[in-house]
Amino acid sequence: MSELLLELFSEEIPAFMQKNAEEGYLNIFTKIFEENEIFAKVQVFVGPRRITLHATHLPKITLPKEEEIKGPSIEAPEAAINGFCKAHNVSKLELPTKLISNQLYYFFVKKTEEREIKEILPEIIIEAINKYSWAKSMFWGDYKIKWIRPLRNILCIFDGEILPMQFGHLTANNITYGHRLTDNKKLEVTDFEDYRNKLLENHVILERAKREAIIKTGLLELASSHELIIKEDNRLVEEVVGLSEFPVVLLGKIPQKFLELPKEVLISSMRTHQKYFCLFDKTGNFTPYFLFVSNGRFTNAELVIQGNEKVLSARLSDALYFCKQDIAKTLESRLGQLEAVTFHAKLGNLREKIERITDICNYIAPNNKDLITAARLCKSDLVSEMVGEFPDLQGIMGYYYAKHEGLNAEIAAAIRDHYKPQGLSDNLPSGNAALLALADKLDSLVGLMIAGETPTGSGDPYALRRQALGIIRIILENKLELNFNDLINFSINLYKDSSDENKNLIISFFEERAKFYFKNDYDIALINAVLDLNLVDTNFKLDALKEFLIEDAGKQLLNAYKRASNIIGDQKITGLVDASLFSTQPEKELFEVIQKISPQIIDSIADKDYKKALNLLSSLLTPITSFFDNVLVNDSDPKIAQNRLSLLQNICELFDKVAKFNRL
C-alpha cells in the first residue's frame, strides 16, 4: 500500500480558523477519495503556517470498472436520443437496451480502465484544495489562486517521490521549513515519518493535540510551582495553540504602578489583547503575575519574558492615561457626546435611546430615583477613552467612574450590570440593574423590530432572539410581576412609526421565545395551555399543572374535561343552569360541588395559588364520573338536555379559568 504526504505552507493562518480548516479538509479529502473509490486512512494537521495531509493504505492502481448510465426510452423523441448519444460519443446502434417497468430504455456502459493512482492524484488534490471555503480569503501579487493567506510552498510526496503537481504558480517539491524564529531553514523530506521527525528537530510540533497538551500542562505546573491558581480558559488555550508551533509557557510580572487600574482592565489587556493568562491566589484574588505562551524555545528565556512585560507595560500605560483622562469628566457631562453616536440609522442616536430607556424605567418603577439616574448615565462610558480602547469594558468602566464620582453602589452596579445576561450561561442582574437591563433590552428589541430587523431563518444580526431570552430570564428569575403586554405597548409608543402590526409582531415574537425558553422543562402542549405574557404567572401555572397531571387523579380529571368538551362540541351554550330541571341525584350533586368550589377557585387564582385551584377541581372527579355513568345528557326532553349541556359548560369554564385544558 502507498503513502501520500501533502503540505500547504503559507503565511500565518488566523488561529480561530485553524480548527475548522482541519475538520473541513479532513472531510473533503476523505469524501473525494471515496468518490474516486480510493479508500485510504486520512489525517489532517493544521498549525500557524502549514496544513498537512497524510494519507496511507492507498492502492497503487485504480481497478477497472463499468458504470451503466440510463438514457431515454426507445419511444422518446429522436432529439432526446441523439442528445444522449452525442453526450457519450456513441451511435444509437451501439447502445444496449433494458426493460424497466414494461418500458425499454437505452443505456450507455461507461468503462474506466485501470490507472496508476499517481496519475490521478494531482487532479484530486487540486480539487480538494479548492473545495474548502474559507470565511475570508485573498488574492496576492499577480497570482490567480485565492487562499486564506499567501501560499509560499507546496510539498507533495507519493511513495518517497515528488508527485508532479502544479497549483497556481507553485510547483510541488519535497521541501518544508522549520520554525520561523529559531530554525527557519529548508528541510528535504522523503516520507511522513521523516517529515514529522525533521519538523520536531527544528522546533515544529505537527500535532495540534500535542501542542494543546503541552500548553495545558505547562500552565498548570508553572502556576502551581508559584502557589498560584489559573482559571480554566479553554477558548484562550485553543487560540494560543493556533499561534504557536513550539509552545513554551513562561511567567511574567505586572509592574506595581499598574495595579491601581481596575482588575477588569488588567484582565482585558492581558487576555484579549496579549493572549496572556491571569493568575490568582488561593483565595481567588487577582495577583500581579501572568503566564504566556512563547512560540519557540529560546536560549535566553529571561529576554523573552522582559519583552512580553515591556509590551504589556506599554498597553497598560495607555490604559492608565486613558483612565486619568476619563475621570476628569463626569458621566453626566458626556451625555451630549452620545448625540453623535448612532444607535441605528432608522432609530436615532444613543442620547435618544437613553431618553426612551429612562421613560421605560419610570414606567416600571415610578419614583425610583436611583434607577432613573442609572438609566440616564448607563451609556455615558461608551464615549470614554477607555471603552474606545477596550470595548468589552462597556458598563464596567461606567461602574468605576460612577463610584469615583461618589454615586451610590446601587447606581454604579446598575450601570455595570445592565448589559447582562449576554447569553444563556451568563449571570443575571438583580435589583435596579435588572430593571435597567430589562428596559434597555426591551427598547432595543422593540425599536429594531419596528426598523425591520426582525430575525429570519437565515440570520439574526442584532441577536434579538438572545435579547428576548435575556428579558424573559430577567423577569422570571427576579420574579417581576409585570403586565408585559402593557409594557410592550408603552415601549412601542415611544417610537413615532409604531403600528398595531408592529405590536402584534413583537408580542408574537416574545411568545415564541417564551415557548423556546420553557420547553426545556415542560411539554409544549402544557406551555400552550397556560402561556401568556405574565411570565411569572405562567411559570407558577406550569409548575402546578405539570405536577397535577403526573398524578392519576389529574389524568382522570383531564379525561373527564375532554369528555365534557366533546359532548358540547361546536354547540354554543348560552343558558344558565336551572336546578329545578334536575331529575337525577348525580346531576344535583355535581351542580352542588360546582357551586361550592367556584368561588374558592376564583380566590385561589387571585392569590396565584394554582395548586390549590387544581386540588379544588379534583373534588369534581367523583361527581362528574357518577354523572357520566348514570345520566344521559341528550335527554328526549329538549329543556333537560339543554340544562345538562349548560352544566357541562359550567365545568369546562371552571377548568379554563386555570388553564386552556382543550390544548392538553
Curated annotation (Swiss-Prot):
A GO-annotated cellular component: cytosol
Enzyme Commission (EC) number: 6.1.1.14
Entry's localization field: Cytoplasm
Catalytically driven reaction(s): tRNA(Gly) + glycine + ATP = glycyl-tRNA(Gly) + AMP + diphosphate
BP-aspect Gene Ontology terms: arginyl-tRNA aminoacylation; glycyl-tRNA aminoacylation
Keywords, ordered alphabetically: Aminoacyl-tRNA synthetase, ATP-binding, Cytoplasm, Ligase, Nucleotide-binding, Protein biosynthesis
InterPro entries reported in the protein's UniProt record: DALR_anticod-bd, Gly-tRNA-synth_bsu, Gly-tRNA-synth_heterodimer
GO terms, molecular function: arginine-tRNA ligase activity; ATP binding; glycine-tRNA ligase activity
Pfam family, one: DALR_1
NCBIfam families per record: glyS (TIGR00211)
Subunit structure as annotated in this protein's UniProt entry: Tetramer of two alpha and two beta subunits.
Family of this protein: Belongs to the class-II aminoacyl-tRNA synthetase family.
Protein name: Glycine--tRNA ligase beta subunit
Organismal lineage: Bacteria, Pseudomonadati, Pseudomonadota, Alphaproteobacteria, Rickettsiales
